[in-house]
Amino acid sequence: MVQQGFSIDLILARSKEEATDGKDSMSSRPHIPCAPQPLPPTKYAKEMPRKKDGQDVQEHTTSFQCSLGEQVINRPSANPSLAAMHRSSGSSDEFSPPGSEDDSTESSGRSSQENDTEQREKSPKSDLQRRLRTAFTPQQISKLEQAFNKQRYLGAPERKKLATSLQLSEIQVKTWFQNRRMKLKRQIQDKQHSLVPPPVCYPQTFPYYPGGFPVPLNSGSFYQPRALPFQAPQHSYIPQPLHHHVRMSSHQEQYPPLFGAQYM
C-alpha cells in the first residue's frame, strides 16, 4: 500500500513538473512575427541637416547610414534574408535616407508659394496705377477749358507753363487735352447724326412713251419712235344674209366677205 501511494504521488508530481516545464518553455520561446516590424524613428529622420556646406551634409548622411545599419544588425529579425539585404544596403552608396523626398516637396512648395506672394504683391500696385485718376478742382477745369477753347493742341512750352500755373504735371495736362478732344469729336458726330434725316425709299417712276417701252430717267440719250395718227377705215363693214342655194358641208366653214376692213 505504501508503494502504491508512493507511486501515485510520484505520478502527480511528475505531471505537475511537466506542466510547469511546458509553461516555462512557452514563455522562454521568442516571438516570431509574420511581417517585419518597422524601425523606430530616429532624430536623423525627424530633422535632416540643412547646411549649405557639402562636407557637413555628407558626414551627417554617412553617420545616419551607419546608425541604421547597426540597428538592423543588432536587432534580431525572423527572416535572415531581410537582415542580409539591410546589411548590403547599409554599405552601399545608393541608400537614400527617409525624409529627402519630403524636403524636396517642401522646397518646391515654398518656392511656388513665394512666387504666388510676389505676384500678389505686384498685381495690386499695377491695379492701383491703372485706377488712379487725378481729381481736378473746378478752378483747374475752368482754366483748362479756357485754354482748350483758345488752342486745342498745346506745344511743350505752353503745356509746361499751364501745368506749373495749375500745379499739375505735364502728363496730366496732356491726357486731359486728349480726352477733351475725343469728347468734342463725339459731340460733333452726335449732332451730325441728329441733323441728317434718315433716308426714305420712294418707288422709282418711269415716263410713258406711246411708241416705245418705258425708259428710266437716269438714261441720257434714248430713242423715241414717231407716233402715228389714228386712221379710220374707208368702208364700213355690213354683214349680208346667206343665200338658200348655198349648202354647208360638215367639213367646210363659210365666212362673210370682207370689204376694205382693217384690223387695228
Swiss-Prot record:
Compositional bias per record (Polar residues), positions renumbered to this chain: 60-80
SUPFAM superfamilies to which the protein is assigned, alphabetical: Homeodomain-like (SSF46689)
DNA-binding region: 129-188
Stored SMART domains: HOX
Localization (cell): Nucleus
Transcription keyword on record: yes
InterPro entries, per database record: HD (IPR001356), HD_metazoa (IPR020479), Homeobox_CS (IPR017970), Homeobox_NK-like (IPR050394), Homeodomain-like_sf (IPR009057)
Chief location bin: nucleus
A Pfam family: Homeodomain
Region (Disordered): 16-140
Domain-related comment: The N-terminal region is required for repressor function.
Name by which UniProt lists this protein: Homeobox protein vent1
Gene designation: vent1
